[in-house]
Every structure is written in structure tokens, then in C-alpha cells.
Amino acid sequence: MSAHYTTEPPPTASATLHTTFGPIHIALFANQTPLTCKNFLQHCLDNYYAGTIFHRIVPDFIVQGGDPTGTGSGGTSIYEYPEFEYDPEARDPNEKVVLRDELHSRLRFNRRGLVGMAKSEDGTYGSQFFITLANAERELNGQCTLFGRVEGDSIYNVLKIAEAERVERTERPVYPVKVVSCEVGELGPFAGKLKRRETIATAPAAEEKPAAKKKKKAKGGKTLLSFGGDEGDEDVPLRPSKPKFNPTLVVDAGIPPANDAPKKTSPEAEQQTRKRPRSPSPRRSLSAERKHRPKTPDPLTQLPLPDPESPARSPPQSPPARQSILSRTRAEIENLKASMRRTVATGPADTGRKKSALEAMIPETAIRGRKRPPPGTVNGAGRGSSTNGVTGFSSAAEDETLRMFNAFKAKLESADAKSGPHGKTSISASDTTKYTSQAKSNTEPEDEEAQLCDLHFIANCQSCKSWDDTGTAEEAPDDDDRDWLTHELRFGKDMLGKDLQWKREHPDDVDSLVVIDPREREKEFVGGKRRGLERDRERDRKRERVGDQEWDRRRREKP
């Protein structure tokens, strides 16, 4: 921020606005913008801004205030008073001053905390000012007069004002911040030229609101002094132009009635009116409303903005919509609950016969349950019932099932008894493996060529063998029908899985998984390398012994 300070000229005057959120210290560039600073300082001296509000808040842009009406369309400059119409610091001292733009090349809206004048529609300035909240060069440079900046920690009070809650879809705060008082610190070049004005400070407010027209009071009857002896005193009675009482309540004999021919009411009608008072007619109420209706305001007077907290004349349309949505949702929930209930009657249809007293006591929504006979009885209601009361199945079918189960059980027991003395018919897994291995070894050389696979050239290849091949089953002898009754199921050792023990017993198996430990391989490689180096060294030693002798011999032979 110091880079921006170096481009700005030094301020020469200062003022302070005391708000409900704290003070705002403003330094003024009086040498660069003399007319604008003079206008602002004079308003501060006159306490013109006391009671005004910050009526406009635009987030990340500006905070605007200085309007005594609080609407954004009020406020006047000091140059509208005769005392300040001519200023020697203006461009033409002989012409009336109209406060317009005072632009300077070193004053730019390039940061927050800069104070400028709010321009009206006709391009002139009044008393309204604004404080920037961010960089606004594109929007404000060359458009509005920059005449000051916020000093010190008071910029945080400006940020608090900018965080105020706003009315929906407007730039007006709900609870606006008010300026309590004004204080002038340094006048700078205006020292000795500006002073506080007591009577003129309130003049613009009186000019803005024109005085209401007062009704002229009725003048009393003009009479001459009477000394009791003049002629005509007795003939002309003195009466006021307007009675001092309500003629509808009090009747004066001296005043003629409003209607020349009053209507005569019959005694019967008078009795009816006494017994039952008549309610006021709508015409009379309408006339009363028209009589008490306020006059239309003057279009030239400034009206304040509508208070956002005041109740609206017409009720909003949103609550009925919410109620309709809520009622629709509740109706959908009730329909869903009703669909989940059992609404179909399970009882017998009405045959038209007369119900007994006991049946009449049963509610219509009751569900009739299934009749169950007591346990132990074959039929519940009578001989014709076909279901059992306990299981719900037919008793005859149940007896037949039990009979068949007992017969099968007896058959198994008899088969075990018959096979017991002769020995067990089951064969252990080890015997079967031995038998199959011997049979294979006996038949392998004979059937090796016949059983070779055409694709893999492997004997008894399981990949090429069809799963539904029943050749072995046809060749096997037929077993007795009763052998399966006494057969015991036993599983042999899985040779295809090749567990760890089998691998240890068959280390040379090609299909077995080979595990290579890199550390062992490293040891073997290092050991072999060392052994190879030792062999090379030994070979070199032998060659050196022989070579030395031959070399020496050849060297000697050379001239």
C-alpha cells in the first residue's frame, strides 16, 4: 500500500466522522481539490452530517452516505447559499460557483479507503460522499472527484459498515449506520476563512420541505361599540358565524334546521328505532372514509424510502404456496400409508343371511384366521377333514412316508448284518492306490502306444480325455445291487496337488514348482566366481613359470 501513497500528494486538511460503529478519520487533499474540500469542511463545521445514515452499500465497491433525507436524492452544497455563491478560488471569480468535477492526475481510485463525491444526475455535486472498498479505477477514474482518504485503523470501521445486512435485492442496509457528530481537525489553506454557521446550516432543510398551508381562521363579527342608547342595537342580535357546539348533538332553537321541511316520523317508527338501533349504512361509511382520507402529497416534496420493517399492505403470496405444498405432501404420505394397509377383506362374502348376535359383535375390519383342530385329533371339524392340525399335511400321506422310511432303514440294517460276517466290502484308499498302480504298471507297456494322446503325446492325457468317456465303466464288472448299501466313501491322496512332502520325496519332478532363493543363488555365484578365479590364478602361475623360462631363452637367443 505504500506504493500507492508515494503517488498521492500529501493531505493538507482533516476531519472526523463519529458513527455508531466508531470514528472515521479522513485526510483531505485541499490543495488539489479546493472547492470540494471547502464544501466538505464547511458541512462538518455546521454539523450538517449529524443524524445522516450510510444509505447505500455495494459490496466490494463503495459505501455511500451524506444525504440528510436518507433516500439518496437529497443534499445540497454550500455554494447554493448566497454567502458562498462567489469564490476567489474558482476558475472565474465573477461567476457563481457550481460544484463540478475536480480531477487530478495523481488522485486515482486504485485502492480501498478513498473518499469521493457522489454525482447527481445533472453532473453536479451536493453533500453526498462515498468511500471505496476495493480498486475502482475502471468505474470511477475520470467520473467522480477524489478529495480524501481514510487514515489509520478507522478503515476497519468502514469495513464493518460494509458488512451490514441489506434488504433483499436492494443496496439499502436493513439497520443503517448513523453519523453521530462531525469534528474538524485541520483546515489547512482554509484556516481563518471557514467558521461554524448556526442559522444557515438549517436553512436548506427548511427550503426542502415547504410549509403546509394553514387554514385561515374565521373572523368574528365586526360590530361597533355600543353605549346602550344607539338605534338598531335591539334589532340586530350579535351571533357568531359558526356555532360553538355540535349541532347533531345539541339543538338550538335560535338556529334554523338544515332542512327546510323535516320529515315527520310516526310513533311506530320511533318505537322500532328505539328498540333496534339501525346499523350505519355503507354509503355513510364510504363518505366518512372519503372525508377522513388524507390529501394527496405535493409531488415536489421528497418522500423517504419505504421502511423495510413496516408490514406490507397486501399479504404475501408465498405462505399459501407453502401450505399447499405441505398439504400435498401430507396427502401423499397418507395415501402411501393407506396402500400399505390391508384393505381387502379376507372373510367370506356376504351371502345375505342374517348374522347372529355373536357375529354382529365382530367388527368388519377384523381378519378371520385359519381354523386349526386341536393336536392329537385326526380331523378337526369332522370326518371329512383331510389335513392334520399340527403339520397341515394329510395324515394318510404322513403315515405312508413313515412306513417307507422304516422299510429303508430296515433294509440298510439287514445289508450291514449280511456283510458283517463275510467281511467288509469296502476297500481302503491305500489298497486301491496300490492295486491301481500295479494294474497300471502291468498294462502300461502293452497299452502305451494305444493310450498316447495325439496332441500332447502323453499316455492317459486327461486334457484330451472326454469327461463322458464310459469305456472304463463298461469294461468294469457289474457290482451287486446291494453293494452300494454297505459301501464306505473314502478319498485317496490327491497326487495332482503335489503337497510339500510329495515334492520333497520327488525332487526331480518336472512339473513341480521350483523356488529360487536369490540369496542362495548369490552365494553360489560368488562361490563359483571365486573358484573360477582361483583356477585362473593357478593356471596363470603355471604359465608364468613356463613362460619365464621360454621367454628368457628367446630373449637370449635374439641378437
From Swiss-Prot:
Main location: cytoplasm
Top EC class, one word: isomerase
UniProt EC number: 5.2.1.8
Entry superkingdom: Eukaryota
Classification via InterPro entries: Cyclophilin-like_dom_sf, Cyclophilin-type_PPIase_CS, Cyclophilin-type_PPIase_dom, Cyclophilin_A-like
Region (Disordered): 201-395, 413-449, 518-559
Bias type Basic and acidic residues, positions: 261-273
GO molecular function terms listed in the Swiss-Prot or TrEMBL record: peptidyl-prolyl cis-trans isomerase activity
Subcellular location: Cytoplasm; Nucleus
Full protein name: Peptidyl-prolyl isomerase cwc27
Organism annotation: Aspergillus fumigatus (strain ATCC MYA-4609 / CBS 101355 / FGSC A1100 / Af293)
Gene that encodes it: cwc27
